[in-house]
From Swiss-Prot:
Keyword Secreted: yes
Tissue: Expressed by the venom gland.
Similarity remark: Belongs to the arthropod phospholipase D family. Class II subfamily.
Entry GO MF terms: lyase activity; metal ion binding; phosphoric diester hydrolase activity; toxin activity
Identification of the protein by name: Dermonecrotic toxin SdSicTox-betaIIB1bii
Function comment: Dermonecrotic toxins cleave the phosphodiester linkage between the phosphate and headgroup of certain phospholipids (sphingolipid and lysolipid substrates), forming an alcohol (often choline) and a cyclic phosphate. This toxin acts on sphingomyelin (SM). It may also act on ceramide phosphoethanolamine (CPE), lysophosphatidylcholine (LPC) and lysophosphatidylethanolamine (LPE), but not on lysophosphatidylserine (LPS), and lysophosphatidylglycerol (LPG). It acts by transphosphatidylation, releasing exclusively cyclic phosphate products as second products.
Protein source organism: Sicarius cf. damarensis (strain GJB-2008)
Disulfide bonds: C45-C51, C47-C190
Keywords from the named record: Cytolysis, Dermonecrotic toxin, Disulfide bond, Hemolysis, Lipid degradation, Lipid metabolism, Lyase, Magnesium, Metal-binding, Secreted, Toxin
Major subcellular site: secreted
């Protein structure tokens, strides 16, 4: 999976897909009451990027629904995964449950259209900290209460704050989540980061019977040397400001026979068995 990073303006969706991304990440900004308002990162952000692009969240969902719906004029077959980077760190942790309710309802109304949409992308909920786990509880409660619990099959969980992996496991255990879990490891493209935690996540992913990590990705990679390093370690995905660079690296002799771009037929919740 090649995730286009910080795709917050509607016009950026095609831009990143044209560069080779098959997944996009966008930031969701909330008001003080936990209501999702806009797709927006804000300052500071990655080096060399404009941090202020944005869209109204519901309008963004309406557009991305079309982009991921077969036979729609806007349909782009390659886009199979949407990563929602939830800016919960900007609101009170007491509002995390309200935020989870709101995002679930907006996805129901504007993306899935309560069963009337054929939009098919998988959804990854990127949570900044284990302290915000009530968002996940609320999201799942809302799908159940609204009568659309089946959409849980399309939704995965990912904690992005580089926290202790055992602490993340404990929170997932509290929530009763034993599947559909991704694990991110990374840092803004402005800085270098070692591989110790990334290696630990990959080791846990590959441990038989360990159900708290199905996929691992590294972020935000812009240098080809770091992309190569991550691929050699065996990541499932790369988040990048430059998907075209990832494409070029994947075509190199070292990687061409080992990796390919994920398609809709690849289940993002299953561990890869090479």
């Amino acid at each position: 999976w090649i995730m286009g990073h910080m795709v917050n303006a509607i016009e950026q969706v095609d831009e990143f897909l044209n560069l080779g991304a098959n997944a996009i990440e966008f930031d969701i900004d909330f008001d003080k009451d936990g209501i999702a308002q806009i797709t927006h990162h804000g300052i500071p952000c990655d080096c060399g990027r404009k941090c202020t692009k944005k869209a109204i969240f519901t309008e963004y969902l309406d557009n991305i629904r079309q982009v991921t719906t077969p036979d729609d004029p806007k349909f782009r077959e390659q886009l199979v995964l949407l990563a929602l980077d939830l800016k919960l760190q900007r609101i009170s942790s007491a509002k995390a449950y309200r935020a989870g309710e709101d995002v679930a309802k907006k996805l129901l109304d504007h993306y899935w259209q309560r069963g009337n949409s054929r939009a098919r992308a998988y959804i990854l909920l990127n949570i900044p900290s284990v302290e915000d786990y009530e968002f996940i509880r609320a999201f799942k409660d809302t799908l159940k209460n609204e009568g659309y619990e089946s959409y849980n099959d399309k939704v995965g969980i990912n904690f992005t704050g580089n926290e202790d992996l055992d602490k993340i496991r404990d929170v997932l255990e509290i929530l009763g989540i034993h599947k559909q879990v991704w694990q991110a490891d990374g840092i803004t493209s402005c800085f270098a980061r070692g591989t110790e935690r990334l290696k630990e996540a990959l080791e846990k992913r590959d441990t038989p019977g360990y159900n708290y990590i199905n996929k691992v990705y590294a972020w935000t990679l812009v240098r080809k040397s770091i992309m190569r390093r991550s691929l050699r370690l065996g990541v499932d995905g790369v988040m990048s400001n430059n998907p075209d660079r990832v494409i070029k690296v994947l075509k190199e002799k070292e990687f061409a026979d080992k990796f390919r771009l994920a398609t809709y037929n690849d289940n993002p919740w299953e561990k890869f068995r090479g």
